[in-house]
Design a protein with these regions (language model features):
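Domain-level signal for soluble alpha/beta catalytic cores
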Residues: 1-801
């Protein structure tokens, strides 16, 4: 078929099925790199592709899933050689049926900063190399699949968009709780990928058809009309022996439900074979894809936080240097600790979005804003409003932002619109339009509305839909232009009613120069909400203003059952005189922790600098062991418990571990200065088994275990069984952790366990990895199965203390 036919939705398009299990079944040996099949067993690889083509697959995914420089290191072949040979095999198989050939690209196998160590641009460069090779080899499209990190997916999409002109398909893998391994939601994935220009969006791997169905329904509601949706489930759920629980007939029967929800492309992933695709083809060929009716909604997001702007939404204003000497100094010094503390404090006070401004004379705004975004993403999961009119600053900040942000702002000047709107479109950002132009701010509502009309028309022409446009009719100070308040609100109402866009105001501007500013701010906020205000840029640490917002949400049925209102005020006693809560400082940051423990709270919040400062302060009054046992370990336990319950996600877990590590450095220095032995809770050896180059999960386990006080020897990835045995023998470790992500390397995990038993070493073995289950772990001889890093830490505490 022609690639353009993939998008016409006249019939279902069929993707192929599993590759790794097919290679394994046809002779791939344990430890042999699947990516080299095109060079080492080309006839076998071509035969697999041919079987899928004959089964009815319209798109054949080349065997390039792991063909990147990181995973091919030491194999003796270049990325270009492997990609070219792999696409040639798929192209040969496609000759008889006319199937399209996709350059298949999977994750790089490392977490990106801040959760890991791989820089965003380094990830981009890795993907770009593969994509250039695939385009040169004649691929028809780029297929990014099995992604779990939205940041990595963004790097891959940008690499595809900027290095070839091929269509780009994207797919993420979700766990049973409806989030990816790193905590990304279906909705955040949908709006981010579509905003970056993905031509088709889907879900693959991890689960079977029945389990993926509710997530696919959410995806269909979230992806814009015109963007096709596809699904590639596994052949059900894994059995203890590594097989899957559905046969082709059962798989096709469960898949049939997808025909009615808006999906237009179907295929299979792990465990599926040409027989599965043939049965899928028989089932879906008589059917026509149902219309997909997405919900047109205004939204902003980070991977783990999806904010739908369907009512009043609070934008924290405190990370703006105007009138804030302490923040100005922090920006000049390149000190991220203070703005990060402000971010956390605003989030806990009720902000849903954070305004971020680095516009300060005498500093490099572009570099500062870029670094500020990186630092803030490490400590908060709130979406950011990038507050700048500097195209370079916005370009750099938008590029490294993880999710869908909002840009503040453009105005009615054509020159500004021409520079900023294309950036918003490229990076999928929403945009704020200020109702002013070279003539200044019109004094009347009619004048501001006219500018708003021009901005909306220009944004639409740039490809930005109305749901991503926010108009700021501008708040003037009542002390200087008293009549301006009414004009602002009238213009706001007209924009909302007649233009069909969202609205935004900097609320606190109303009271400059007048006493008791809180009275004016709160009253104006209430008036603006009644007029249709969507985004209120304000100080969320002001109790009266947040009370007005929460009460308004109750009375307009935005806060159903008054849930949030009750949670905020159930234990509050209204007094005649109230004291205003200010943004938390290092000294105040522990107020919510047991005994007002600043170190506990700094670690819980993932604030590295504050954790170090709090540890230094605690060590002047307490013994190091007391600081560890009373503050650090309980904080890690609290974050770990949240991770288990699904209220804390992987990025926050790792940031808490990083903050704890900063505190541990202070504790170690104190112990060393005193001449005491530091000691260890116990020694643990961990490794990714022979033939497996995936070590994300293993690295996370190491970080968590180290922060609980264990001495961890990390042998790395692709580790021979003999190295593990020798390491345990030399260290005397009582616990060994083994990781495997690929089904083809699980036999090597079993071989490593058998080698440890044969050596009669006094140790227990815990295993983990995406392909493992408790039953499978038991069958290969492991003592324990650990589903995640928290489970590993719990087991270590149980066995080693």
């Amino acid at each position: 078929m022609q690639i353009r036919e993939v998008f016409d939705r006249k019939r279902f398009v069929f993707l192929d099925g599993g590759m790794g299990t097919q290679l394994q079944a046809r002779g791939l040996q344990p430890g042999q790199k699947p990516e080299l099949a095109a060079l080492e067993m080309p006839e076998v690889l071509t035969a697999i592709h041919t079987d899928y083509a004959n089964a009815g697959a319209d798109i054949l995914l080349a065997n390039t899933f792991g063909a990147n420089a990181k995973k091919l290191t030491g194999c003796g072949h270049t990325v270009e050689e492997v990609v070219s040979a792999s696409i040639a095999c798929a192209r040969k198989a496609a000759e008889t049926t006319g199937a399209c050939v996709a350059l298949d690209i999977g994750p790089l196998g490392e977490l990106l900063v801040p959760a890991g160590t791989l820089a965003f641009e380094d990830a981009y460069n890795e993907f770009a190399q593969v994509i250039r090779a695939g385009a040169a080899a004649g691929a028809d499209l780029v297929f990014l699949e099995t992604m779990t990190d939205l940041y990595e997916l963004k790097a891959a999409i940008l690499a595809a968009r900027e290095n070839c002109d091929l269509p780009v398909f994207t797919s993420m893998s979700f766990e049973s709780r409806g989030r990816t391994f790193t905590g990304c939601t279906v909705e955040s994935y949908a709006v981010t990928a579509a905003g970056l220009g993905a031509d088709a969006v889907g879900i693959n791997c991890s689960l079977g058809p029945k389990e993926i169905l509710p997530f696919a329904q959410r995806l269909c509601r979230s992806v814009p009309a015109g963007v096709p949706i596809f699904v590639k489930p596994n052949a059900g759920l894994p059995n203890p022996d590594g097989s899957y629980n559905l046969d082709p007939d059962e798989f096709a029967a469960e898949m049939k439900e997808y025909a009615a929800i808006g999906v237009s492309m179907v295929g299979g992933c792990c465990g599926t074979t040409p027989a599965f695709i043939a049965r899928l083809h028989e089932t879906f060929s008589p059917l026509t894809p149902a219309d997909k009716i997405p919900i047109r909604r205004s939204c902003l997001c980070t991977p783990v936080r999806f904010v739908e702007v369907g009512g009043i939404t609070v934008v924290g204003e405190r990370i703006n240097p105007t009138g804030k000497k302490r923040l100005q100094q922090a920006l000049r010094d390149g000190d991220s600790a203070y703005p990060c503390t402000q971010a956390v404090a605003q989030a806990e006070a009720g902000a849903q979005v954070l305004d971020v401004n680095a516009g300060l004379p005498g500093i490099d705004e572009a570099a500062t804003l870029e670094q500020l975004v990186k630092d803030l993403q490490a400590v908060t999961d709130l979406p950011l409003q990038l507050d700048s009119s500097n195209p370079e600053a916005l370009s750099r900040a938008l590029r490294i932002y993880n999710g869908k942000p909002i840009v503040n702002s453009v105005n009615g000047e054509p020159e500004t619109l021409e520079k900023i709107l294309p950036l918003c479109k490229k990076y999928g950002a929403a945009v704020v339009g200020l109702a002013l132009d070279k003539g200044g701010i019109p004094p009347t509502a009619e004048g501001r509305f006219a500018i708003a009309q021009r901005i909306v028309a220009a944004a639409n022409a740039a490809g930005i839909p109305n749901e991503d446009i926010y108009i700021d009719c501008l708040t003037l100070t009542a002390s200087a232009q008293q009549e301006g308040a009414v004009q602002t609100l009238e213009a706001l109402s007209r924009c909302k009613r007649e233009l069909g866009v969202r609205t935004v105001l900097g609320v606190s501007n109303i009271s400059f120069g007048l006493p008791c500013r809180g009275y004016l701010n709160t009253t104006f906020l209430t008036m603006a909400m009644s007029a249709g205000l969507d985004l209120a840029i304000m100080n969320p640490n002001t109790p009266e203003m947040m009370a007005a917002v929460r009460a308004y949400r109750v009375l307009t049925s935005q806060d159903l059952q008054s849930t949030d209102y009750v949670a905020a005020y159930a234990d509050v006693q209204i007094q005649t005189t109230q004291t205003s809560r200010s943004a938390a400082t290092v000294a105040e940051v522990g107020a919510a922790a047991p005994g007002g423990d600043a170190l506990f709270e700094a670690v819980r919040r993932g604030l590295k600098a504050e954790a170090r400062a709090a540890a230094d302060a605690a060590l002047t009054m307490r013994e190091p062991l007391d600081v560890v046992n009373v503050s650090l370990i309980p904080a890690l336990d609290a974050v770990g418990d949240g991770f288990e319950k699904g209220t804390v996600f992987l990025p926050q877990l790792l940031q808490a571990a990083t903050a704890a590590q900063a505190a541990f450095e202070a504790i170690k220095a104190k112990i060393a200065a005193s001449g005491q032995a530091q000691g260890s809770k116990g020694k643990i050896v961990i490794a990714t088994v022979k033939g497996d180059v995936h070590d994300i999960g293993k690295n996370i386990v190491r970080v968590i275990l180290e922060n609980y006080g264990y001495d961890v020897l990390d042998l790395g990835r692709d580790v021979d069984p003999e190295r593990v045995v020798e390491a345990v023998r030399q260290t005397g470790a009582k616990l060994v952790g083994l990781s495997a992500l690929m089904t083809t390397t699980v036999p090597n995990m079993q071989a490593t366990i058998e080698a440890l038993h044969a050596a009669h070493l006094d140790c227990k073995v815990m295993v983990g990895g995406a392909v493992l289950t408790p039953d499978y772990a038991r069958d290969i001889g492991a003592d324990y199965y650990c589903k995640d890093a928290k489970a590993s830490a719990d087991l270590a505490k149980q066995l080693l203390g």
